[in-house]
Swiss-Prot record:
Gene from which the chain derives: SYF1
SMART domains: HAT
InterPro entries per record: HAT, HAT_Syf1-like_N, HAT_Syf1_central, HAT_Syf1_CNRKL1_C, Syf1-like, TPR-like_helical_dom_sf
Name of this chain's protein: Pre-mRNA-splicing factor SYF1
Organism: Yarrowia lipolytica (strain CLIB 122 / E 150) (Yeast)
Family: Belongs to the crooked-neck family.
Location of the protein in the cell: Nucleus
Subunit structure: Associated with the spliceosome.
Chain segments annotated as transmembrane: none
Function: Involved in pre-mRNA splicing and cell cycle progression.
């Protein structure tokens, strides 16, 4: 007897001798049959030993590895029997149940496997069910059919978060009804999950017959309420479901409801296009079958297409019920006069003036214009329009202006004037135009636009005195504007009331600081031919003191002095202009007037002043003109000195200046003066190139980020000495 047998005999209730015995024969030459006998002895001796049964079952299952479960069904059945035998006493051991299920899944025994799954779930505690169910789910996925459905139902009880996966699996297996039920449960639990709704609706759309609780119609209707932004696609899905189920009239009702209740053009377009396609298919079917109903359906389809622009208008008006623009678009759709009038009536009744989006007055005006050929009705509408409590005075003014213009165009100018006059009459003249607590009707008499039109109207059809009274009323109401000043002054001028005209200009100047210069300009132009010199001088001095940088005032003042023969006074004015407005244009104008009155030579002091005052770029330009002027006068040395002096303002990149100097030296210079020119040019070039500040500033000027380079920031006046000319007793030294 072997030692293992002795150990077992000495310790019959101990599992360890059996384990050692079994381990010793695992890798020796003992046959499988002999090993099985040993395992049988062991589990018979200790039937409750999990270790022994686990070793035995692993060994017997391993013997089936690679064997075809159909050809060797007997061998598989014997192993199955062993599992059953072990579970009699070890039914609380989840590992054995799981191992048994995995072994069964290798065999074509669907019913047996389902039975074992149920037994495992009954035998094991609830905490162990998920392990069994995961394995069962693999089995269900493998076999499919009702078995898979039932397993999924059991599985999601343990894993409720896997319901969406269950729905996907059921859809793949073709169980649309069961999948829809799962999706409905998910939607009821999760609320507004649009992805699930889309999945459910698509599922319904793919199923010709689907009985659900709640019904499909109710489900999709619920989706429309939950997801109003998807109203269009969901409505089409519902209608298509009804069509597939043969309920065409109900589908048509759904389409009609969809196009008449859509809140966006996008939803409307989706539903309308599907509706039209649905009707076209019906018409095609009826025509192919020569049905007598074909003509009726064609007529209904045509009517549907004709309704489209009106239905779109309905959609827009549902979104913007107080939009004047949308109501105008709606009215434009009608061709029948009666329908147009009805639309206008509906529009003005539907828009509360305080909530109007846009100018409600334009709606009333266009309605009145609709009756342009019926003066009595048009005037009645205009009158009603003037009673509407508009949000702004401007809208009420639009109505009065349109009404008056209508009467004027129809040669009823007296009525045109009367309409505006009545609008502008008010017992309370002290109200504020901007007081929104008052109605537009209470403030209309302060409308500048209406007064302006009234003044033009009275001027066209009334007398001078009547027009004058209008302007005086405007002034009394403190409604004067710069335009009123100019118009009133022009009216007085045309009727030879010059002193009153001057007073109007002066009042405008005192009231409008921002526009005072323009008014001064007109005032001085009008006053120059009519007032004495001393008074005019006072006016000009006053204007210039207020606007010292306005070149036009100096030019006008200087011209006055010249016209009166006081040329030297004019020159003083031009000199003052150059003191206050330091630009090349002002100096050129001053130089031009000096040349005309005193000749070229007299311009030297002006040029000197310009070179002292102007920034580099302008100084360079004037220096060139100055030198060329001296050249014309034959003053060659003076011209050369000016070229040299002006070079400090002139970047050598300014080709014009140095080209002129070059030509001058070629024409009048010597070799020495030419060399001096080149030396100065090189010196200036070096100065401009090495001045870092200049280089940086020039780059920024090129980009437009800073002002241009000005004299005094780089090369200072006098830094470069003019070239020394040849000894000449007539040489003139410039003190510039």
């Amino acid at each position: 007897m072997s030692q293992h047998e002795l150990d077992i005999a000495s310790s019959p209730g101990d599992v360890r001798p059996w384990i050692r015995y079994i381990s010793s024969v695992k890798n020796d030459k003992t046959t499988a049959r002999q090993k099985c006998i040993l395992f049988e002895r062991a589990v018979t001796a200790l039937p409750r030993s999990y270790k022994l049964w686990k070793e035995y079952l692993d060994f017997r299952s391993g013997l089936c590895t690679g064997l075809n479960p159909i050809k060797h069904a007997d061998e598989y059945d014997r192993v199955n029997a062993l599992y059953e035998k072990s579970l009699v006493l070890l039914h609380k051991m989840p590992v054995i149940w799981l191992q048994y299920l995995q072994f069964l899944m290798l065999q074509p025994k669907v019913t047996k496997t389902r039975s074992v799954i149920n037994e495992a779930l009954r035998s094991l505690p609830v905490q162990q069910h998920p392990r069994v169910l995961k394995l069962a789910l693999q089995f269900g996925t493998k076999v499919g059919g009702p078995t898979s459905v039932q397993i999924w139902k059991r599985y999601v009880l343990a894993y409720p978060d896997q319901k969406e996966t269950m729905a996907q699996s059921l859809i793949k297996m073709g169980y649309h009804g069961e999948a829809a039920v799962v999706l409905i449960e998910l939607l009821n639990a999760s609320g507004d999950n649009y992805a699930l709704w889309t999945e459910l609706v698509d599922l319904i759309g793919e199923s010709d017959k689907l009985t659900l609780e709640p019904p499909v119609e109710q489900i999709i209707s619920s989706g429309i309420k939950r997801f109003p932004d998807q109203r269009g696609p969901l409505t089409v899905q519902l209608a298509n479901f009804l069509v597939r189920n043969g309920d065409l009239e109900s589908a048509r009702d759904v389409f009609e409801d969809g196009i008449t209740t859509a809140n966006t053009v996008r939803d409307f377009t989706v539903v309308f296009d599907a509706y039209a396609e649905f009707e076209e298919r019906i018409v095609t079917h009826l025509i192919e079958n020569e049905s007598p109903m074909a003509d009726l359906r064609i007529a209904k389809l045509d009517h549907l297409l004709e309704r489209r622009p009106f239905l779109i208008s309905d959609v827009r008006l549902r979104r913007e019920p107080y939009s004047v623009l949308e109501w105008q678009k709606r009215i434009a759709l009608y061709e029948d006069p009666a329908e147009t009038v009805a639309a206008y009536t509906e529009a003005v009744q539907s828009i509360p003036p305080a909530k109007a989006d846009g100018k409600l007055s334009q709606l009333w005006i266009s309605w009145a214009k609709f009756y342009a050929e019926d003066r009595e009705t048009a005037c009645e509408i205009y009158h009603k329009a003037t009673l509407v409590p508009y949000k702004s005075v401007s809208e009420l003014a639009d109505v009065y202006l349109a009404w008056s213009q209508y009467e004027s165009e129809n040669d009823h100018w007296e009525n045109a004037v009367k309409i505006i006059k009545q609008a502008l009459e008010s017992p309370n003249t002290h109200v504020s135009y901007h007081n929104s607590d008052l109605t537009a009707q209470d403030r209309i008499h302060k409308s500048v636009r209406l007064w302006s039109y009234y003044a033009d109207l009275v001027e066209s059809y009334g007398t001078f005195e009547e027009t004058k009274q209008v302007y005086e009323k405007i002034m009394a109401l403190d409604l004067l504007t710069p335009l009123f000043v100019v118009n009133y002054a022009t009216l007085l001028e045309e009727n030879d009331h010059f002193e009153e005209m001057f007073k109007v200009y002066e009042k405008g100047i005192s009231l409008f600081e921002e526009s005072a210069f323009e008014i001064w300009n007109l005032y001085l132009v009008k006053a120059s031919p009519r007032l004495g010199l001393e008074r005019l001088r006072d006016l000009f001095e006053d204007a210039i003191s207020k606007f010292p940088t306005q070149k036009a005032l100096y030019i006008l003042y200087g011209k006055l002095e010249e016209d009166r023969g006081l040329v030297r006074n004019a020159m003083r004015v031009y000199s003052a202009m150059c003191d206050h407005v330091k630009t090349s244009e002002t100096f050129k104008y001053y130089i031009g007037r000096t040349v005309e009155n005193f000749g070229l030579a007299a311009t030297r002091p002006v040029y000197d002043k310009a070179l002292e005052s102007l920034p580099n770029k302008d100084a360079s330009e004037l220096a060139l003109d100055y030198a060329q002027m001296e050249e014309k006068l034959g003053e060659i040395d003076r011209a050369r000195a000016i070229y040299g002096y002006g070079s400090q303002f002139s970047d050598p990149q300014i080709i014009k200046y140095y080209d002129a100097w070059h030509k001058f030296e070629v024409a009048h210079g010597t070799e020495d003066t030419f060399k001096d020119m080149l030396r100065i040019k090189r010196s200036i070039q070096a100065q401009f190139n090495t001045d870092i500040h200049y280089a940086t500033t020039a780059a920024e000027v090129k980009k437009g980020t800073v002002q241009e380079f000005v004299k005094g920031e780089t090369v200072q006046k006098g830094n470069i000495e003019p070239p020394v000319a040849q000894a000449n007793e007539d040489e003139i030294e410039l003190d510039i």
